[in-house]
Swiss-Prot record:
Primary location: cytoplasm
UniProt-annotated binding residues for Zn(2+): 86, 102, 109
MF-aspect GO terms: magnesium ion binding; phosphoribosyl-AMP cyclohydrolase activity; zinc ion binding
Classification of source organism: Archaea, Methanobacteriati, Methanobacteriota, Methanomada group, Methanococci
UniProt keyword Amino-acid biosynthesis, yes or no: yes
Cofactor(s) needed: Mg(2+); Zn(2+)
Protein's cellular compartments: Cytoplasm
Name of the protein in question: Phosphoribosyl-AMP cyclohydrolase
Amino acid sequence: MDLDTKEIIKNMDLKFRNIDGKKLLLAISTDKDRNILMTAFMNEESLEKSIETGFMHYYSTSRNKLWRKGEESGNVQKIIDVFRDCDGDALLFTVEQTGWACHEGYMSCFHNKIDLNTGKFTVVGNKLD
């Protein structure tokens, strides 16, 4: 017997943190080779939508709303696996990425390498077409 989404989330024993007055947790998405694609926040509703649809949904703290990854660009993230960290306040999602993950056109949002001697950064990733 399959459980409903709320019961699944309850069984995950997550610790949503109070961030800007919202109950959120960190979501990290990687490809199947564990290359980090992006990080974002999730609230309970975005986690529910992700579980129900099989595609990543996040909570935007700047826009104060739920969003489905790729809703405008078509660059969706299909969920393959999910892992809970030891504290229960972060989730790691393995996803099948369509197109690029970064809104700037890079596969990963982590394409700026920082020089710790100067604090300046250099773009190390290539933009995708």
